[in-house]
């Protein structure tokens, strides 16, 4: 499918040609943006369709562009919040490791906005989790901890409100 062809960080020329052929066989484009969004692929799909020179129906192109702009903005806000959280943890002498999208967006993707993120995941030592919760609660625009899903793994969901966006932070 088109989404399968677009589900790659980079698209070499041969892959772009395959993507273009696949796109050429699509009769109904209406559901493509919502499917791409559902699978976290809207920004990558737009990037690869453009690179392949695919003639995308105008309404679909607009939807993909809007989704891409939204993800770019959200990732910028989340990245800024992540930098603040990591700086606060470092200042407190707490070692941490960024997991999942927060790391992958910056390590694998040519532009972080190509990797949609829903939250930030940070790993800390079990015995420092309570201190992390206190640090996060003291940050500007902090939101109270929502819940600890599993006390054995100290999985804590909390967050910050930044630039009109809720930045969910999961401490593992």
Language model region names:
Residues 1-118, 124-172:
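Conserved NTP-donor binding/palm subdomain of two-metal-ion nucleotidyltransferases/polymerases, i.e.
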């Amino acid at each position: 499918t088109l989404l399968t062809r677009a589900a790659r960080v980079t698209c070499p020329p041969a892959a772009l040609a395959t993507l273009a052929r696949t796109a050429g066989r699509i009769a109904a484009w209406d559901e493509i943006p919502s499917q791409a969004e559902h699978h976290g692929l809207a920004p990558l799909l737009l990037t690869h369709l453009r690179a392949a020179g695919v003639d995308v129906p105008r309404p679909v192109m607009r939807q993909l562009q809007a989704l891409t702009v939204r993800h770019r903005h959200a990732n910028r806000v989340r990245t800024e919040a992540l930098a603040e959280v990591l700086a606060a943890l470092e200042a407190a002498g707490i070692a941490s490791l960024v997991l999942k999208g927060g790391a992958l967006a910056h390590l694998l993707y040519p532009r972080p906005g190509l990797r949609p993120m829903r939250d930030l995941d940070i790993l800390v030592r079990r015995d420092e989790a309570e201190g992390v919760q206190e640090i996060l609660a003291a940050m500007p625009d902090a939101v109270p901890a929502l819940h600890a899903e599993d006390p054995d793994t100290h999985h804590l969901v909390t967050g910050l409100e930044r630039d009109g966006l809720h930045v969910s932070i999961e401490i593992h």
